[in-house]
Design a protein with these regions (language model features):
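Intrinsically disordered, metal-sensing/regulatory segments
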Residues: 1-258
């Protein structure tokens, strides 16, 4: 029988995933978006996810581990081990489903269809651990705050949806098809949520470990996938300010939604 945790976690991840479509349909608002504009939006999204990782996953994870493992040294080993396990998980996903980074190309008018779809696969791959994080967060008790995490992921999905739509238009798709395909990339997140909940339902002691693992996956995605593609070294202050703005907004929301 499906319990409330499955329903809530799946629904939350589905809503956050569908928000990707908001970004996708933004392709109709302007004839052309500059690369700088998209990069600033993605830098803000990276800051949002950094804050969501710390405030909604890593911090409560450490508190949860300390409840079950009083020895702080041992708790630290568990926490760091789970964190790096999340990194390994994403690395394995990337290795099993190879893709290429495609920052410059997805703004051009004549990108190759192969490059376009490899870029979309990359976006979809990293939405799986985001959904996993939502599922893990909903599996916890009152110590955890899944709402702020869901809001953070939803906000991040908007510029990503727009980026995918721009990539598809550049490959020759109509704006409507581009927006619809961009929306579909978010549907990976509820699948990840169901996986996360299923694993966490086995034992409540696994939940804080799972939170740290999920935090590791998100941090690696941000550091390895998003920032290298969008951080402008020629305008580093603007890029840094955008990341900090996103972090500050999410930090505020984490406090308000607590």
């Amino acid at each position: 029988m499906v319990n409330d945790v499955f329903i809530q976690g799946f629904t939350a991840a589905l809503i956050a995933g569908l928000i990707t479509g908001v970004g996708g349909f933004m392709i109709f608002l302007k004839k052309k978006y500059s690369r700088e504009y998209i990069n600033v939006m993605l830098n803000i999204a990276a800051g949002i996810m950094l804050a969501a990782s710390f405030f909604s996953l890593l911090s409560p994870s450490l508190e949860g581990i300390l409840r079950f493992v009083p020895d702080r040294h041992v708790a630290g080993y568990w926490f760091v081990g789970a964190l790096f396990s999340g990194v390994v998980l994403v690395w394995l996903l990337n290795a099993l489903l190879p893709h290429e980074h495609n920052s410059a190309g997805h703004h051009g008018p004549n990108i190759s269809l192969r490059s376009c779809w490899l870029f979309i696969i990359a976006i979809s791959i990293h939405k799986l651990p985001e959904g996993l994080a939502v599922g893990v967060a909903y599996s916890g008790d009152e110590l955890y705050n899944p709402l702020s995490l869901v809001v953070g992921i939803a906000l991040q999905n908007i510029p990503e949806g727009l980026t995918v739509a721009i990539s598809l238009v550049g490959a020759g798709y109509s704006r409507l098809k581009a927006a619809l395909y961009a929306s579909c990339t978010g549907l990976v997140q509820p699948i990840g949520a169901l996986i996360g909940i299923s694993i966490m339902e086995m034992n409540e002691k696994i939940v804080p470990i799972g939170m740290a693992l999920a935090g590791g996956t998100l941090l690696f995605v941000i550091i390895n996938e998003i920032l290298p593609e969008t951080y402008n070294t020629k305008k580093s202050q603007k890029s840094a300010a955008a990341v900090f703005l996103g972090f500050a907004v999410m930090a505020y929301l984490s406090i308000v939604l607590e």
